Amino acid sequence: MTTYDDVDYDPEVVNIRPAATVMLVDDRPDLQVFMMERNAATVFAGGMWVFPGGAVEHEDHPELLGDITMGRTDADTSKLMAIPSGGIAYYVTAIREAFEEAGVLLAHAPGEDQL
């Protein structure tokens, strides 16, 4: 079992950063949820079962995205999340992290509605 007795996660000491997490759920009758086991050597949550996710990066922000958000705007996504702005960056982060960490690409071809 991994312990963190010698690690300080006090928010006054550790910088808290905006981050996004993805829950992938298969809604068949036997409900399945996709999770990953983190490498035991990882300092933060090593050996733990987690959902794919991670920190919002500068490149995830809307002014750098171009026309890849399929009509979703920062204003729309921010309103859904009840935050003043930056909502679209959380969406982009979730998609990017799902692919980087788990190889799951949450996307569809232009003109298609299915992932």
Language-model region placement:
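N-terminal leader/linker segments that precede catalytic domains of diphosphate-processing enzymes
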Residues: 1-115
